[in-house]
Amino acid sequence: MIRSTPALLPHRLSAAVLSALCLAAAPVAFAETAADPTTLDKVVVKGERAEGYSVRKTSAGTRFDLAPREIPQSISIISHQRIEDQNLDDIIDVLGNTTGVSSTQSDTERTEFYARGFYIDSYQFDGLPTQMVQNWSYGDSGLDLALYDRVEVVRGATGLLSGAGNPSASVNLIRKHADSAELAGSVSVNVGSWGRTRTTVDVGSALNASGTVRGRVIGSYLDTDAQMDRYNQHKTLGYMVIDADLTPDTQLSVSYDYQQKRANGATWGGFPMLFSDGTSTGYDESFNASPNWTYWDTTSKRAFATLEHGFANGWKFKIGATHDETKADDKLFYPAYNDWVTGASYFDKNTGAGISPSAGFYNTERKVDAIDGFVDGPFQLFGREHQFMAGLSYNKRDYANYGDYQVGGAGLAWDPFSSYLNWNGNISEPNWNPLSLASEGTITQKAGYAATRLSLADPLKLIIGARYTDWKSEGEGADRSHKVTTPYAGLVFDINDTYSTYASYTEIFQPQMLKDRNGSYLDPVDGKSYEVGVKGAWFDNRLNASVAVFRIEQDNVGQSTGEPVIGGTGGETAYIAARGTVSRGFEFELNGELAPGWNATFGASRYVAKDINDADINTNLPQTTLKLFTSYTPQSLQDLTVGGGANWQNRIYYAVPAYGRIEQDGYTLVSAFVRYRISPEFSVQANLNNLLDKKYYSQINGYGAFGDGRNGSLTFTWSF
C-alpha cells in the first residue's frame, strides 16, 4: 500500500499560484523597457506561421476569430513550437501536458482524459465535431501529431459547437496545410530509449507556376519497444494535403491521412495489485501481465475537405466535410483476480492460484461522415458594429463490433496455467470460435447553431447563442431520439488594453440508456457550466494569461429506484432523474513569449467534484495539478535553445472495500531539452523525460499500470 501525502499541499499550491500571478504581472514592467514587440524576431518553420507558444487569434469555442482574452471560457493552446520542443508524439503526450487535464491509463492502448472531474469525449478536427469512445478502442488516444499544427482545448461545457458530450472540455486538432509556394521540407530521425526509432519526412511545394495550388506530404514511421517486457509498437502515418487559392477570396483544401498502429504484447486492463491477504503484489515497471500472443492493431483512414470564401463586406462562408473509417483487430488477455463489488482478491501469494484467465478476440469497425457549414461576419445596429454567425452540422457514426470471449480454468476447454507466479507470458492461446456480432448501431446528430457578439459599449461585449440538436441512436435494441436546445452566454469587459474580465454560462447534454418505471428512456444528462475569470494579453497577444473560477452541475442523472421496469425484461431496474455531480474549482494559465527568445507555459488547476451523496468521484484522478514548461534561446547565441519543465499532481486513491484503499502519493515529473542548430540546414535536439526516474502508477483501480521511467531521445533534423 502506498501511504498518503502530507497535509502541506494546500500551502504549497497557494504559494505556487501566488508566484504565478506575480509572473503574470511581470510583463507589464518588462513592456516599459523592451523594444517594440512588433520588432521581435520570428522563427518560420517549413513555411508555417509560427506563434511561439501562443496564438494571436483563434475561433475556439465560438467560431468567431477572437484573441484569447476576448473568449469567455478557459482555453489552452499547444502550439507547433511547443510540440517540437517537448517532442510530443501523440494526443496522449499533448493532453498529458495541458492545463487542467488529467488521465488514467486503462491499458497499453487506451488512455482516458478528464477535465474538471469529467471524462473528455468531445473532439474536433479543424472544427468538425466528433465523439471518441474507449469501451471499444479504435486507437483514438494514440493519434499521431505529425500531421497537426496545433491543438486547442476549451474547458467546461462546449455544447454550442460540440453537440452531445460531457461538461469537461473539447479538443480541437488543427491540421497542417500546404502553405509554401517554394520547395521546402525536412527529414528528421529520432532515436531513443527502449530501441525507439522514428523517421519523419515533411515536403511541400507549389504545384503550379503561380503558386496558387500547393501540395504537402508528410510520412512517419515509428518502431519502439517499451519499459514493459515483451511489448513492441509500430506506427505508420501518411498524410497529403492540397491547398488551392481558387480566387483571391476563395480557398479550397483537400486532405487524406492514413494511420496504422501494430502493438504486440498489448495489455487489457492492468496487472493485479493485491494478493488475497491484502498485501501488494509488488510487480516492477517491466512486468507485462499479458501472454506473448496478444496484440492490438488499429487502422484509420480519413478524407477531409474545406471550402472558404470571404466577401467584400467582411462576411465569410466556410464548409467542411470528412469521411473517416477506422478498424481494430485485437487478441487480448485479462487476468481476472478479484471480486468486482468488494475488491477482495483471490490471488494467493504462496501458490499463485486464484487468477481466472479470460481472453477476447475482437474485430471492430467505425465509419464517420460529417459536414459542417457556417457564415459569420459584421453587422451594424444602433450605431455600433456587432458580429453574427450561424451554421448547420451533420454527423453520422456507424459502428459494428464482433468478438469471441472465452474464460479458462480448471475443468474448462482452455486451462493455460495453474499458477500466476513466475509469469513469463508463455501460455497457450484459446481455440477461438468464429467471431459473432457483439454490438452494432448508428448515432446521428443533425444540428443548427447561431450566436451573436454584441458590442454593448466599447469595453463590453456580450456573446449569446444556442444550438438545436436532433440526436438519434439506432441499434443494440435501444433506439432512442432526443431533441435538445443548448444555450450559450458570455460577457466580456475590457478593463484596459491589457486585462479583461468575463462571465459565462454554457451547457452540453449526454444521452443515457436508462429507463423509468414505465419503460421510457430518461432525458439526457444536462451539464451546466458557470465560469468567471480574468484574462490578460501582452506583446500583441504573444503572451496570454487567465485565471478562472468555475462550477459545473449535472442534472437528470439516472438514480436507481430498486424497482423493476413495468413490462421490462427480467432484472431490468427502473431509474429516476436526479441531481448528479457538482464540480467546483479554479484554473490559472500563463502561456506565450515572456521576453524575446523566452517562451513558457504554466498551468495550475484545482477542483473538488462530489456526487449526490456528497462523496468524491474519480478519486483515482488528481484534483490538483501544476504543469510548467519553458524554452529559452539566448539573443547572443540564437543557434542554441534550452528548456525544461515539471508536472506535479496531488495524492490519489482507489477504494477497495475488502482492504481499505490503494493510495499513491503526489509526485513530480521533470523534463529537459536542448537543441542546437549546427547550420541553417542541420539541427540536433536531445530530450529527457522523467529526469529523476520517479516510479509512479498511471492507473490504480484494483488493476495497476506504471508510467514511463526515465527515458530520452535524440532528434536529427535536416531542413531544406
Residue ranges and their predicted role:
Residues M1-Q86, I92-G100:
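N-terminal Sec signal peptide and the immediately downstream disordered periplasmic leader
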Residues S103, E112, L128-R155, I174-R175:
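Short acidic/polar hinge/loop motifs at secondary-structure boundaries
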Residues Q131-M132, L147-D149, L160-G238, L246-T250, ...:
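Outer-membrane beta-barrel translocator/receptor signature
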Residues L222-A226, Y239-D245, D249-G310, E325-R366, ...:
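Acidic/polar loop-and-plug regions of large Gram-negative outer-membrane beta-barrel proteins
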Residues D245, R366, E385-R397, L437-Q554, ...:
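Structural signature of Gram-negative outer-membrane beta-barrels, strongest in the C-terminal barrel
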Residues E308-A312, K316-T322, T326-L332, D526-E593, ...:
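Membrane-embedded beta-barrel scaffold of Gram-negative outer-membrane proteins
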Residues A457-P459, I576-P657, L692-K695, T715-T717:
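Gram-negative outer-membrane beta-barrel transporters
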Residues N647-A655, A672-F720:
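C-terminal beta-signal and adjacent terminal beta-strands/loops
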